[in-house]
Every structure is written in structure tokens, then in C-alpha cells.
Amino acid sequence: MDMRSYIMECLERHLSDYDLDGVELTEEDVDAVERQIIKNNLTLNNAIEAVLLGISNILM
């Protein structure tokens, strides 16, 4: 499994933590996680949290 597939799997696994069940994730969401890791020096878990929190805030 490549890193991008792993990131997508992690994103999908944590959707329910943010009441985002049913939200369709895209490659742009994976890009956002990668940007968070590189730009803000976040761990994978923290980057996923930041992206999902951002999606949640936009939808609420």
C-alpha cells in the first residue's frame, strides 16, 4: 500500500469521529493532509485531525 492510499484509509476510518459519516473524500483531502505534514510539521494523526476538523467546520 502506498502512502496516499494509507492516508485515505486513515481519513475514512476517522470520519465518524467528526460526525462526517457519508462524506465523500477526494484526492484533494489527501493533498491537504500532505500539506499539513510538510508545511506545519505535523504528525500524520495531527494532520488528519486538522483536515477533518476543517471539513467539519465548513459543513457546519
Task: Name the predicted role of every residue range.
Residues M1-G22:
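N-terminal acidic leader/helix
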Residues E24-M60:
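Short, charge-rich amphipathic interface segments used for partner binding and complex assembly
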